Amino acid sequence: MVFSTKLYTTKLLKKLADLRLAIWLLASIGILIALGTFIEQDQPLAFYQENYPTTAPILGFVDWKFITSLNLNTLYSNIWFFGIVGFFASSLLACTYTTQIPALKKFRLWEFITNFKSLRKFQLKRQLPRNLASTSVYQLYGKNYHVFRQGKKNYAYSGLLGRVGPILVHFSILFVLFGSACGALGGYTVQEIVPRGEIFHLQNLVKSGNLSKIPQYLSWRVNDFWITYTEEAKVNQFYSDLSILDVKGQEVKRKIIFVNEPLVYNGVSVYQTDWDILGLKLKLNDQQTIQVPLNKISKSGRNFWLGSVFLDGNSKQKITILLNDLTGNIYVYDNAGLLVATTKLGQLVVFPEDQSLRFQEFLTTTGLQLKEDPGLRLIYLSFFLVMVSIYISFLSYSQIWGFEKTDEFILAGKSNRAVLAFQEDFKKDVKEILNTLKFN
């Protein structure tokens, strides 16, 4: 019973390790990924109804009903997609277990040549005096060869590490697959628009995996927000001063972030993505402080912010406020649309009938994207293994055999890479072995 179970397991592993199956699975994954690139993922239903209407289906059948019925809009989190990826991972593991690891073990074993005729197939060989057989063992050992001797036969190999490359490639692919699966199941993305000085929790969930956990024990505070400009008055960079608070409101980490410089804490990365101006805080007649909301208007690729306020209670003196950016210039227009003042924060603007105002502060918001991907480290590890495997794959695996006859000693060798370099090293080794005769 145990024997039949073991035999069945061996047959199953060999079928899983079949190269044709692995190629077919890899091609299927590639096609699905390409399909996921073509069809936008994780969008609202209205998006697919608008872009893939039933009145004009692509190829005559691809419409929003077709996409949603097959879950092509959430391709990378589908159970059947994970099934194919898992099947491919099983094929790689089976190949590693049944082919690569046994081959590596075989290369570690000695492989003696038992007769002189077997040496004829080697192009690289040399006849030496019979008494140099033992000398060759010490010479090769000093060249970092693993040397074995049995009776009149020698065997040596070097560069076994180069044979580990295929195994590392397999594991790097496995780590990519597992890392991607962990990210899809346990990761999430949150988008937040937060006014300066406000404290917020993660609420506006854009994307999340079935096993993701949002850290509600943390809160976040936007301490400050500002923008730097180029000499041409174009946005150079925008910054957010962020703090992470624990359940007691104590600050556990603080950092100034900007584009491509996120804040990272316990696997959560906070990226700077956008910004906006909500309004202006101003003081009327040096008495009443009010907040004026501003509306964002985009025209010809530029953004403007407009707002209005009445200077008196009779609603007669209405002014319009215009902002181009946060450089400090504020443009004030009257009821007729005429520019009456260009001012900055803190400056007093005087109007007829003893009316005045003073702009005090910009009310800004910062756009933040918060992400957690638990599989990211596995993916980084896979890239590292790929680089290591590329490096060690260039290491030559060299083998040298020795066979003693009645009156001579035959030395032969071969290498899987850098054949010319191995030939030169082989000739050099033979020369050094012969040189030992001069000292004896």
Swiss-Prot record:
Mode of membrane association: Multi-pass membrane protein
Statement: the UniProt record of this protein carries the keyword Transmembrane: yes
UniProt-annotated location(s): Plastid, Chloroplast thylakoid membrane
Major place of residence: plastid
Coiled coil segments of this chain: none
Secretion signal span: none
One GO term of the biological process aspect: cytochrome complex assembly
GO cellular component: a single term: chloroplast thylakoid membrane
Transmembrane segments: 19-39, 78-98, 164-184
InterPro entries in the cross-refs: Cyt_c_bgen_Ccs1/CcsB/ResB, ResB-like_domain
Assembly information from the UniProt record: May interact with CcsA.
Record protein name field: Cytochrome c biogenesis protein Ccs1
Gene of this entry: ccs1
